Amino acid sequence: MPHIIVKIAEGRSQPLKQELADRLAATMMDVLGLDSSAVSVAVEDVPMQDWMQQVYGPDIETAGERLLKRPGYGQLASPPEE
């Protein structure tokens, strides 16, 4: 029963967020071999000026080994790809 929570900078249209949710759900079903009834997706808009305090600090910096894809900004930035 996976539930995906996506936090994005506000300003995306509802159709774009729906497409994102549909694609994420489809990938989750494909990779984990799940039925669509098992997957749910929520999209949270975050004001850009609040991103570091509301998302980066509590969700990214404290994730430890759970953070499987690092961002390209902030203290935990991944090294540039060559």
UniProtKB/Swiss-Prot annotation:
One of its GO terms (cellular component) is cytoplasm. Its EC number is 5.3.2.-. Pfam families: Tautomerase (PF01361). GO terms for molecular function: intramolecular oxidoreductase activity, interconverting keto- and enol-groups. The keyword Isomerase applies. It comes from the Bacteria. SUPFAM superfamilies: Tautomerase/MIF. Belongs to the 4-oxalocrotonate tautomerase family. This is Probable tautomerase XF_1725. It comes from Xylella fastidiosa (strain 9a5c).
